[in-house]
Amino acid sequence: MKGTIFAVALNHRSQLDAWQEAFQQSPYKAPPKTAVWFIKPRNTVIGCGEPIPFPQGEKVLSGATVALIVGKTATKVREEDAAEYIAGYALANDVSLPEESFYRPAIKAKCRDGFCPIGETVALSNVDNLTIYTEINGRPADHWNTADLQRNAAQLLSALSEFATLNPGDAILLGTPQARVEIQPGDRVRVLAEGFPPLENPVVDEREVTTRKSFPTLPHPHGTLFALGLNYADHASELEFKPPEEPLVFLKAPNTLTGDNQTSVRPNNIEYMHYEAELVVVIGKQARNVSEADAMDYVAGYTVCNDYAIRDYLENYYRPNLRVKSRDGLTPMLSTIVPKEAIPDPHNLTLRTFVNGELRQQGTTADLIFSVPFLIAYLSEFMTLNPGDMIATGTPKGLSDVVPGDEVVVEVEGVGRLVNRIVSEETAK
């Protein structure tokens, strides 16, 4: 699997029923209005026969599902045309820890090494009434039917392609029921469905799994892009949040990246789109279970990004959700990397944002809540970081709305200067 793995939560009616009462309470206050998207990064993807690493002391659930495989570039596809963009389907397993909340991105639950086995692609025309079976050690353990999904494959492809261009090889996991099968080290998990070759994986204590030296490569020059929310106390206060006690990490899809001196589109009929100047840390070598003291040894260097957000699309599900943060071209980033040796202290850099020459945002990386080495140690505790992976470390206070015609310049001291222009949807066509 060489593309981006998108997945959707709360897409089975049993999940919505189970969480119905909770979704009326804080922090949700209402059921989700749109599909609740998340990303399974490249470290999660394994093939049939490869071991699923079992993290010590955790409860782990097998989430048998089916993956839609994109066959050609898809942008703003109508539901009735979706079949033209589907190469086929594959059995998949959205392995997960139990969900305690859907408010913030579930990176610890969903993004661990080997937590996304995917089988062979089969050229089926429709999976809207497909029964998916799970066997554990050769015995039936569970089954469910895709007819009980809230949104079918065509609806999901249409909804995702409305804001994110999909490329050949990308996949969409269609969802899982609320009830899933608990797995243990020593189990063999088999996912079955008519018309598909079985997807079978052993479950192995993660201490016995040799770190994979290579992972499926994405069809773009970048690795996984991790981003931090509320990692400056003044920015958290600006948005009326308490500073987080644990890093608020979310993932950004490749479609959102663009370069220096490029344009970003402000969608029609929105009220607030803002910039975010950020220092980006680029990983230089594979990192797993790295200590904070050793973490800087795994840094290749630094670059700059502008992590735009469309606040109109915020919902209290996996906040900040993909519609806010992973729209096409919404993350300008410099293509150059400044070697870490040229930046003696990444925690003493000034960040600035100018809009049409006016200084709108200024801060310092000295105010990071979670430092660069802490973030590397934190992430590598439960997942493998690979060369080319990036961590956008968050933004200080000073947000303001930007509109078509604005020139937005973000600077990080010693790292670089990034220029971007805002255009309307009509201009972008």
UniProtKB/Swiss-Prot annotation:
Pfam families: FAA_hydrolase. Pathway: Aromatic compound metabolism; 4-hydroxyphenylacetate degradation; pyruvate and succinate semialdehyde from 4-hydroxyphenylacetate: step 4/7; Aromatic compound metabolism; 4-hydroxyphenylacetate degradation; pyruvate and succinate semialdehyde from 4-hydroxyphenylacetate: step 5/7. Keywords: Aromatic hydrocarbons catabolism, Isomerase, Lyase, Metal-binding, Multifunctional enzyme, Repeat. One of its GO terms (molecular function) is 5-carboxymethyl-2-hydroxymuconate delta-isomerase activity. It comes from the Bacteria. Its EC number is 5.3.3.10, 4.1.1.68. The keyword Repeat applies. InterPro entries: Fumarylacetoacetase-like_C (IPR011234), Fumarylacetoacetase_C_sf (IPR036663), HPA_isomer/decarb_C (IPR012684), HPA_isomer/decarb_N (IPR012686). A divalent metal cation binds at residues 276, 278, 307. It catalyses: (2E,4Z)-5-hydroxypenta-2,4-diene-1,2,5-tricarboxylate = (3E,5R)-5-carboxy-2-oxohept-3-enedioate; (3E,5R)-5-carboxy-2-oxohept-3-enedioate + H(+) = (4Z)-2-oxohept-4-enedioate + CO2. Its cofactor is Mg(2+). Approximate repeats lie at residues 1-215, 216-429. One of its GO terms (biological process) is 4-hydroxyphenylacetate catabolic process. The keyword Lyase applies. Decarboxylates OPET (5-oxo-pent-3-ene-1,2,5-tricarboxylic acid) into HHDD (2-hydroxy-hept-2,4-diene-1,7-dioate) and isomerizes it to OHED (2-oxo-hept-3-ene-1,7-dioate). Belongs to the FAH family. PANTHER family: 4-HYDROXYPHENYLACETATE CATABOLISM PROTEIN, ACYLPYRUVASE. Monomer. This is 4-hydroxyphenylacetate degradation bifunctional isomerase/decarboxylase.
